[in-house]
Regions:
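Short, well-ordered beta-strand segments
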Residues: 14-16, 224-225
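Conserved AMP-binding/adenylation subdomain of ANL enzymes
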Residues: 3-14, 21-124, 128-135
Length: 248
């Protein structure tokens, strides 16, 4: 399976990985993806403690000025808190203008795939104006070159997805697991819907089945079943778990 089928970068892009490097998500979505594009990779310096490493993240962002970052929802929430604390410190007038700009952009973006439209055409000039007046300065705190985040590891709530898209740094949610090396699907600029996990990587087959292995009708819950070269060969020296997981 090819992560580049859902994670699109340019040769001149720099990716900052702020996730543990001993996990296959950082390897595949980070190192191997950027190697495929001929791009550059940066990591956060490890501190003497976990807290020291976290404090190195904003320093690394300022130094690297990344185009893309691998992140998790917990860090994204902290980024938002930091941004809004900075806005609040500028006074009530700036905060009120910021909130108006944010709500206008969220309304314009709708569910991302259907953003804009004739009903929201009047919002577009305001989106561009406030992007230059407010959100451009916000993005400067992330180096001024950020295109998007790739988020994983936990559910990314829709409010956060709407927020980062509104300020011009979309955080695209993906889904996967280590047994699938590890990307199954992801949103991207080419195809995103807030609240979804995006398109599956190519080449890979996916279906949603019931307990008996039958494909469930659209709209019904079931188990995600995948098939492809990205699926693991099995668990190390654990044939019982392998037999229970690898069905076909």
């Amino acid at each position: 399976a090819l992560p580049i089928s859902v994670i699109h970068c340019d040769m001149d892009d720099v990716m900052l990985i702020i996730l543990p490097l001993d996990h296959c998500f950082a390897h595949v979505a980070g190192f191997y993806t950027m190697m495929s594009y001929g791009g550059s990779i940066a990591t956060v310096p490890v501190g003497k403690t976990a807290m020291a490493t976290l404090k190195n993240i904003p320093i690394a962002i300022r130094e690297v000025r990344p185009h893309v970052m691998l992140s998790v929802p917990a860090l994204a929430r902290n980024f938002r808190k930091s941004i809004e604390a900075g806005i609040k410190a500028k006074g009530p007038k700036v905060e009120k203008l910021y909130n108006f700009a944010l709500n206008n952009a969220i309304a314009y973006n709708r569910e991302y795939w259907n953003r804009g439209g004739w009903q929201n055409a009047w919002r577009y000039p305001l989106v561009k104006l406030f992007d230059r007046l407010i959100f451009k300065a916000v993005r400067e705190n992330f180096g001024g070159r950020m295109k998007f985040f790739v988020g994983g590891g936990a559910l990314l709530d829709i409010a956060l997805q709407r927020y980062f898209c509104a300020i011009g740094m979309p955080m695209f949610q993906g889904y996967g697991l280590s047994e699938a090396t590890p990307i199954i699907c992801s949103n991207s600029f080419e195809g995103a819907i807030f609240g979804s996990s995006g398109r599956i990587v190519s080449p890979m087959e996916l279906k949603i089945c019931d307990a008996e292995g039958n494909i469930v009708p659209d709209g019904e819950r079931g188990e995600i079943v995948i098939k492809g070269e990205n699926v693991m060969a099995g668990y190390w020296k654990n044939p019982e778990s392998t037999a229970a997981t690898i069905v076909d």
